[in-house]
C-alpha cells in the first residue's frame, strides 16, 4: 500500500525537511498539519509532551492507511464515504494525502466529482469544520483584513468560486465551497503541491436558489445574488488583496462561476494576474487531448473534423477556442477553423439571425443557417453530419439512441464525448455508446463509467476526460516557474503533453486518456513539459533558470510520508571537542 508517487519521483529534498515546532503536547495532535495519530515515535512522544496522551502502541503510516481502507469498505453511501475521508483531512493531513495518492483512481470520484456535488448540496447539513476563506459582499472595503486572517504566509495557489454554477447543479451559493476544497485536494494528491500553499475561497454575493434562501440551515447570506457594480468591485478588491499579501505570481484559479462572469473575468484578469478558469481552459485542454489521442487511432487530424457541440456555454466555448488554436497551428486560418465547429443549445442550432440571443463569445460559431434549420439535436447530427459530437450541456441524456445510431451510420469511427458532470447529467452512458456503435466509437466521459463488455466478448474501458489530468500539472509548472500570466497556449501545450503519455495498449482498450492510477506521474510530466515551454517562451520569472527542468520539478514535489518533528540532533567529531593536554609548569614563587 505504498504511494505510487514515491515510485515515480526522486527523493523530495526541498519540501520535506524536518518540521521545527514551537508548540508541544496536545496542540500537536489537534493540528492536522502536525498530527501523526498513533505514529508519533517514542522520542517524539517523550520530547514533545505527548507521552501518556496516546496508547503505548507506535504505528506505521501503512497500518493507519490499512485501517482507513478497511473502515471505508464497510460504508455503502458515497456521501458517508466523503464525510469519512474529509474527516481524515481535518485530523491528519499527511495520512489523508497518503491514502488518496495510494488509491487515487477509486477515491477521486468520492473526494471530487461526482460525489462532491452531492456533498455541496448537503453542505449545511454535513458541516464539521470550516475550510478556506469566506468573503461576502458585506465585507467590501475590508477584504484585505480578511485575507490577513488566513494563518499561512506562503500561499501560492488560490481556487475561488462564487457558487453560481456548481457542476451541473446550478446556484448553490456558499455551499459551493466544497468545489475549491476538493480541487485543491487534487492539486496536492495529483501534483504534489504543498497543502499549506493552497487556499480555497468562496465569494458570497447571495444566491438565486430559493430553496436555499428558505433553508434554516443555509450558511450564506440570505439575499438574492447581487449582480451590480458592487460585485465587480468586490472581485477587484479580492484579486488585489490576494496578490498584495502573497505576490503578483500567486496562481488564482476561477471555478464554477456563471457563464457570463467566467468569460468576463478571464478577459479582465488574464493579462493582469496569474489566473485561469478551469471550466473554460482546463476542460478545453482535456477535450483537445482526447481528440489528439483519437487522431492516433483513426489517423485523422483534428483540423479535418467537423465538430458539433451540445451546449454553447463556457465549457463548449472554451473547448472550441482551443480546438481553433490547434487547427490554426496546423495551418488553417482562424475563420476556416471556426467554420468547422457548430453548436446546439437549449434554443436550438447556433446560427446567425436566430430569435434567441447570441452573446459576443458565441458569435464566431454562429454560422449561416442551413436551408432547413434542425429542430432537435438528432436532426442537427443528420443535417450537419459531424465526425465528432461533444456534450457539455449538463442537461442529462440528450445523446439519445437515435443520435448515437446516426453518428454510427455517418462515420466509420464516430467520436462521442459525453463530458457533463455529475454522472446523472451525462449525455449518454458508455454502455450505450459502445453497444449502439458496435464498439466502433471513440468515447470519453466527464464522469467515471465501468468497462463495457459487448456480446462478442470485446471489452472497452471508457476514458474519463477528467480535468484533473490538466490543472494540477499546469498549476505545478506555473508555481515552480513563477509565471505571471497564463496564456491559452499553455493549455494547448498541456493537451499535447497529456496525449503523449497515452500508451498503445491503453488505446487498444478504448482509452483516450492514461489511467488515473498514474495521475501523479502524468502531472509531473506535464509540469516538466510546461516548465520547458514557459522558459523557452520567456514566460517564467524564477531565476536562475534550472538547467535540468525534470530534476527541478521532481525535487519539489511534496510527499505525504511523515517527517520528524524533533530538532536536528547530531554529533560533532570527538577530536574537535578535545582540548590539548595542559602541562604543569613551574609557577613563579
UniProtKB/Swiss-Prot annotation:
Enzyme class comes to oxidoreductase
* The keyword Zinc is annotated on this UniProt entry: no
Q: What PROSITE patterns does the entry give? A: MALIC_ENZYMES (PS00331)
Q: Where does a divalent metal cation bind?
A: 255-256, 279
Q: Name one GO molecular function term.
A: NAD binding
Q: Where is the active site?
A: 112, 183
Q: Which residues bind NAD(+)?
A: 165, 259, 312, 314-315
Location(s), subcellular: Mitochondrion matrix
Cofactor(s) essential for the protein: Mg(2+); Mn(2+)
Q: Which GO terms describe its biological process?
A: pyruvate metabolic process; regulation of NADP metabolic process
What GO cellular component entries does it have?
mitochondrial matrix; mitochondrion
Return the EC number: 1.1.1.38
Q: Cofactor comment in the record?
A: Divalent metal cations. Prefers magnesium or manganese.
Which annotated residues bind fumarate? Answer: 67, 91
Recorded catalytic reaction(s): these are: (S)-malate + NAD(+) = pyruvate + CO2 + NADH; oxaloacetate + H(+) = pyruvate + CO2
Q: Which UniProt keywords apply?
A: Acetylation, Allosteric enzyme, Metal-binding, Mitochondrion, NAD, Oxidoreductase, Transit peptide
Query: So what family is this one in?
Result: Belongs to the malic enzymes family.
Assembly with partners or alone: Homotetramer.
Family matches, as NCBIfam families: PRK13529.1
The UniProt function text for this chain reads: NAD-dependent mitochondrial malic enzyme that catalyzes the oxidative decarboxylation of malate to pyruvate.
What protein name is recorded for this chain?
NAD-dependent malic enzyme, mitochondrial
Gene name, per UniProt, is: Me2
Amino acid at each position: 500500500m505504498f504511494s505510487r508517487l514515491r515510485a515515480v519521483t526522486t527523493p523530495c529534498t526541498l519540501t520535506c525537511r524536518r518540521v521545527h515546532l514551537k508548540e508541544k503536547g496536545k496542540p500537536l495532535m489537534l493540528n492536522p498539519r502536525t498530527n501523526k495519530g498513533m505514529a508519533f515515535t517514542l522520542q517524539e512522544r517523550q520530547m514533545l509532551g505527548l507521552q501518556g496522551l496516546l496508547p503505548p502502541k507506535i504505528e506505521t503510516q501503512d497500518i493507519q492507511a490499512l485501517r482507513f481502507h478497511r473502515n471505508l469498505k464497510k460504508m455503502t453511501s458515497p456521501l458517508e464515504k466523503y464525510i469519512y475521508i474529509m474527516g481524515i483531512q481535518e485530523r491528519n493531513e499527511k495520512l489523508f494525502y497518503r491514502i488518496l495518492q495510494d488509491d487515487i483512481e477509486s477515491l477521486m470520484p468520492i473526494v471530487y466529482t461526482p460525489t462532491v456535488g452531492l456533498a455541496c448540496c448537503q453542505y449545511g447539513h454535513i458541516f464539521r469544520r470550516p475550510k478556506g476563506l469566506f468573503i461576502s459582499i458585506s465585507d467590501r472595503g475590508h477584504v484585505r483584513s480578511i485575507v490577513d486572517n488566513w494563518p499561512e504566509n506562503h500561499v501560492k495557489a488560490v481556487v475561488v468560486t462564487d457558487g453560481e454554477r456548481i457542476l451541473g447543479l446550478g446556484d448553490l451559493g456558499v455551499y459551493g465551497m466544497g468545489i475549491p476544497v476538493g480541487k485543491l485536494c487534487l492539486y496536492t494528491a495529483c501534483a504534489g503541491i504543498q497543502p499549506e500553499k493552497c487556499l480555497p475561497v468562496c465569494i458570497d454575493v447571495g444566491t438565486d436558489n430559493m430553496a436555499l434562501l428558505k433553508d434554516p440551515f443555509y450558511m450564506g447570506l440570505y439575499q438574492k445574488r447581487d449582480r451590480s457594480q458592487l460585485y465587480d468591485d468586490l472581485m477587484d478588491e479580492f484579486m488585489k488583496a490576494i496578490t498584495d499579501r502573497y505576490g503578483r505570481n500567486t496562481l488564482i484559479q476561477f471555478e464554477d462561476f456563471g457563464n457570463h462572469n467566467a468569460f468576463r473575468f478571464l478577459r479582465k484578469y488574464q493579462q493582469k494576474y496569474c489566473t485561469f478558469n478551469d471550466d473554460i481552459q482546463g476542460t478545453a485542454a482535456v477535450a483537445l487531448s482526447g481528440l489528439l489521442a483519437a487522431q492516433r487511432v483513426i489517423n485523422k487530424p483534428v483540423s479535418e473534423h467537423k465538430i458539433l457541440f451540445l451546449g454553447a456555454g463556457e465549457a463548449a466555448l472554451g473547448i472550441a477556442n482551443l480546438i481553433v488554436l490547434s487547427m490554426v497551428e496546423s495551418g488553417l486560418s482562424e475563420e476556416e477553423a471556426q467554420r468547422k465547429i457548430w453548436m446546439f443549445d437549449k434554443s436550438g442550432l447556433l446560427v446567425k439571425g436566430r430569435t434567441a440571443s447570441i452573446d459576443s463569445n458565441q458569435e464566431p460559431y454562429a454560422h449561416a443557417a442551413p436551408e432547413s434549420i434542425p429542430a432537435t439535436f438528432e436532426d442537427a447530427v443528420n443535417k450537419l453530419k459531424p465526425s465528432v459530437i461533444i456534450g457539455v450541456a449538463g442537461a442529462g441524456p440528450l445523446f439519445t439512441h437515435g443520435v448515437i445510431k446516426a453518428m454510427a451510420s455517418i462515420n466509420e469511427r464516430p467520436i462521442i464525448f459525453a463530458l457533463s458532470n455529475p454522472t446523472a447529467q451525462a449525455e449518454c452512458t458508455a454502455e450505450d455508446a459502445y453497444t449502439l456503435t458496435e464498439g466502433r466509437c471513440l468515447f470519453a466521459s466527464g464522469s467515471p463509467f465501468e468497462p463495457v463488455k459487448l456480446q462478442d466478448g470485446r471489452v472497452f474501458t471508457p476514458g474519463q476526460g477528467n480535468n484533473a489530468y490538466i490543472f494540477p500539472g499546469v498549476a505545478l509548472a506555473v508555481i515552480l516557474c513563477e509565471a505571471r500570466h497564463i496564456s491559452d497556449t499553455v493549455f494547448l501545450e498541456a493537451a499535447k503533453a497529456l496525449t503523449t503519455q497515452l500508451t498503445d495498449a491503453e488505446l487498444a482498450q478504448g482509452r483516450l486518456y492514461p489511467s488515473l492510477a498514474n495521475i501523479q506521474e502524468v502531472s509531473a510530466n506535464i509540469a516538466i513539459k510546461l516548465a520547458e515551454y514557459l522558459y523557452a517562451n520567456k514566460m517564467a520569472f524564477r531565476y536562475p533558470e534550472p538547467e535540468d527542468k525534470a530534476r527541478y520539478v521532481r525535487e519539489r514535489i511534496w510527499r505525504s510520508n511523515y517527517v520528524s518533528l524533533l530538532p536536528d540532533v547530531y554529533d560533532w567529531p570527538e577530536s574537535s571537542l578535545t582540548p590539548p593536554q595542559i602541562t604543569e609548569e613551574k609557577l613563579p614563587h
